[in-house]
Swiss-Prot record:
GO biological process, one term: protein transport by the Tat complex
Membrane topology type: Single-pass membrane protein
Family: Belongs to the TatB family.
Transmembrane segments: 1-21
Source species of the chain: Yersinia pseudotuberculosis serotype I (strain IP32953)
Entry keyword set: Cell inner membrane, Cell membrane, Membrane, Protein transport, Translocation, Transmembrane, Transmembrane helix, Transport
Name of the protein this chain belongs to: Sec-independent protein translocase protein TatB
Gene3D superfamilies: 1.20.5.3310
Region Disordered, residue ranges: 190-220
GO cellular component: TAT protein transport complex
Name of the encoding gene: tatB
Subcellular location: Cell inner membrane
InterPro entries: TatB
Length: 220
């Protein structure tokens, strides 16, 4: 490495022995030999790295040369097919950009739709005023339904009462009561048979009793 011959090395040892003495000379020799080993290892690593870099560079250059040679040796048919594929790809890219630009102005934006479910379904949520009006109309609907049910009950009740009254009147009218005028009684003498007939009619009326009128609230 340093191009040191045997004679030169022997001269260095003699000078070290004279200067350092026999006690320090072995220590100095070991120290110098360690430095030499370290320098040699560093030099070897640097040489290896440089060699690897050079090999990589040579490989890259050779690959580039092969690629260029392969492209030059391609047949005209392959070149034409490659050119057609490139043109088709460029045409598709241009058409996609044109479609995106034409659809952008016609897009309708709805800033009022903020709910995720409404955006997913495409339905605009109801306005607060509509919801308030619907809640305000709910009690009115319930009151109207209750009033209609009450009216139907009230209308059905008088029919039953009228029917009961009519039945009572029919019962009273159906009783065979003979009307006797006051003048006739005064003018004509009353026979025993007539008295018995009147007594029997009175007994029938008393046994029949007054007609009962049924009302929805209860019996009267």
């Amino acid at each position: 490495m340093f191009d040191i011959g045997f004679s030169e090395l022997l001269l260095v040892l003699v000078i070290g022995l004279v200067v350092l003495g026999p006690e320090r000379l072995p220590v100095a020799v070991r120290t110098v030999s360690g430095w030499i080993r370290t320098l040699r290892s560093l030099a070897a690593t640097v040489q290896n790295e440089l060699a690897q870099e050079l090999k990589l560079q040579e490989l890259q250059d050779s690959l580039k040369k092969v690629e260029q040679a392969g492209l030059q040796n391609l047949t005209p048919e392959l070149k034409a097919s490659m050119d057609e594929l490139k043109e088709a790809a460029e045409a598709l890219k241009r058409s996609y950009h044109v479609d995106a630009g034409s659809e952008a102005p016609h897009t309708i934006h709805n800033p009022l739709v903020t709910e995720p479910e409404a955006i997913h379904d495409g339905v605009t949520p109801a306005e607060p005023a509509t919801q308030v009006s619907a809640l305000a109309q709910a009690p009115n609907i319930l009151e109207a339904g209750t009033a209609s049910v009450a009216d139907s009950v009230v209308e059905a009740a008088p029919v039953t009462t009228v029917k009961s009254v009519v039945q009572g009147e029919v019962l009273v009218k159906s009783t065979p009561v003979q009307e006797v005028g006051l003048a006739d009684v005064m003018d004509k003498p009353v026979t025993k048979q007539q008295i018995d007939t009147i007594d029997s009619h009175g007994t029938d009326l008393s046994s029949a009793g007054p007609s009962r009128i049924h009302q929805p609230g209860g019996d009267q």
